[in-house]
């Protein structure tokens, strides 16, 4: 509540904080402020209010320290009950109406200014202490290693402090001298006040008016006390809210720490899994090398078979088609291999970035630990400082109460002798009223400025609240992202386990296929040997058949046998082509298997990168939480400081209004207050030196924070550049993948199904979120199970490695044999090529010979038939020739029987060969069944490959999501930097406003000095008027004496004249002329005396007018 006395009317206004003017009418006329001066009780109440405000601020500091963690020392920090409870305090008895002393107003104004400056200085010191405590906390948290530099600065500041103390001591000496002068003036004033006791009746009326004003002030005080109680209740509510927020923040921090420990344990497990996976990869590489060697052997065997059966032109087209298909598959495999290489390069770059982020996170964690230790030290120091400050305040309160009691006694004695100068001061009313009007205008301007400042603070508060809400929303979003990352991590772990199981199964299947392929190779070698024997046997048969071309029947049989042989060769070539295609398919499958292994490695690396990114995201979340907490604390402190500034402005206005009344009553307090202030100045200067050091520390810490922030921004820019490159590369990959749209269309349907399942799972997970501890226990049990399974896998790997070592030894021996066989095969292949060419030429020649022999045999048979007819005709005539012919025929018959027996043996041999051929066909059928099984397994492998490609596609989608999340995090970081810049700008604006307020304060001080000078001038004028009044009183005494003498003379003359009149009544006629002449002389004397009095009055008026003009 602010009071504003309205001059020149019968009413005065009370201005409330809301600006509403409450007018109360008074029956008496309004007195000027010179007549209504504040008593010692009013000064005591104002000072008591200020001390209560200081106590409330100290209690708020105590509560802040208790909130920071000094709950055990609560008993040391609590203030006594008589300071906190206004009801327990003794009521101040009203002081009786007293006469106001206007003596020595210049000294009273000086004392008033000194006390007001002192109280403002104390309030500014309290604010600076609060800011220094905050700066100490932040400084000690950030820069614990710069004590030497700060000690040097301390020494410099202590030197400056000693110089300042010397200057202050000189100023104190000057002030003491001034006090001596003031005391002398007070003694003089007391001597003069003893003369002016006649005007006490006039002072009683002023006392009554002062009593009425005191009652109104008491009502305003009661209202202010009610408002203070409401504010205290609000502060208690805010404290409870702060405690709840701090408990929630501490619980969140504990949860984050637990999550960090779990993540570290999972990292260790992942590292173990990676090592095991590398061991498995090495073993798989060895098996792949063995498979490649066996494939090479198979290829060599196929080459031998193809060289042996190169005669068959019918299968060349099929082989060309198969070669084209193989080329197409190789091109597709090359493309996929290039994609895998590109993805590997991306993973390596992401691993580098994650490594850098881990280093930065480690640095931030170290800084956080150092800051926590510094916070604890600062809390201890703050508790100690507050205890000392409370003790000093208690001592000061006691001293102030004693001094006020003394002042009350002195003022009670002085009020009896103060009322004499009221008549002399009435001439000075007009000038003082003009000054009061000017001061009222300035007061209204100050109120307008304070209202504008309040509006600005309200706008700033709203902006800060909006930023806090936005930061809370970002925190919630980051927590949701954290949950999603945890779910993705679990999903990746499951996929890794599945892939490991699938790899183990594939390894077993491949080992089985290797054994079966070895058996097939042995069977094929046997078949080759049988075919070589058959070829040799056929060549022998061809040689024997060339000797026996005589008869056509045997030639037909031989041709049938040759046709059967050619058919069997064609069948063998067809089976050879099938085997070659199957071998190529197996090679392609092995290549795909190798690529799947590479993709598995790629997935492991992606899993590592995602885990690193997860840890990085956790660290960034923790850093953002810490930064948010710091900003919230800073905002709260800024709010409290703004509220206190507002309260201090209102209190300063009240103090100014009250100080106008109390300026003439504060002379006796200066000595004791100066002694105490000298002590306080020393303590506060020490605190200022410490505060300066703390400010330097805070500046250094802010520079370090800005440097680290700039580094983080550079790292983020690099990551963004890399992500841009990767995005361009991904776009190129997408263009390449457009060629495989048929597969993608199939996979998209499955992806939609999986996404639907994932949405269902996410909904279930969102509806069934349990506490983090249960999930952590489950993850620990899963990790133990994984460790057991990994141990088992390591054991199995050990066994498999031992077996692989044996196999490698066997394979080395086989490789040696193979090398020898390859050399031998090359020779055999060359010989077989030559022999095949010779056989082909011989077969063609034999065919031509058979055709020519058939024609010649037909012609010969026809000729023989004609000759036989001729012979039969001649047989009758030539019996002797017939008998000779019979003998020759018998001889030929015996030879033919021999030929038939030999042909029978040949037929038996051919039947045996046919049986072998049938057995070979049965083996080929078995091989076909095995090849069908292999084809089924290959189809299964293709299905697995498709699934793996689906997983890769899902992982690519997850990577894209992660990249988008990283972009969002970068945007959030940019927003945070913008908010920091805005807060810094606001702080700068507030600093500028504080500078402006300081300038206003200096201007007010200058105006107060000017007013003091005017008061001094008025005092001088008053002294001059008093001297003139003394002179006038002396002159008036002289004039009164002269008038008395003239009056006596007139009386004597009048008496004489009356006597003469009585004597001369008898002699009227002759003596009338003489009497008239004497009467004229008397009237002339009276006129001269009246003219002298009129001149003296005009002179007095002229002197008074000149003095007023001065």
From Swiss-Prot:
Task: From the record, give the cysteines joined by S-S bonds.
Answer: none
Looking up PANTHER family in the UniProt record yields: COILED-COIL DOMAIN-CONTAINING PROTEIN 150
InterPro entries hit by this protein? CCDC150 (IPR038807)
Write out the coiled-coil annotation as residue ranges.
Answer: 122-250, 288-313, 413-695, 728-1048
The organism's superkingdom is given as Eukaryota
Record's keyword terms, sorted: Coiled coil
Q: What is this protein called?
A: Coiled-coil domain-containing protein 150
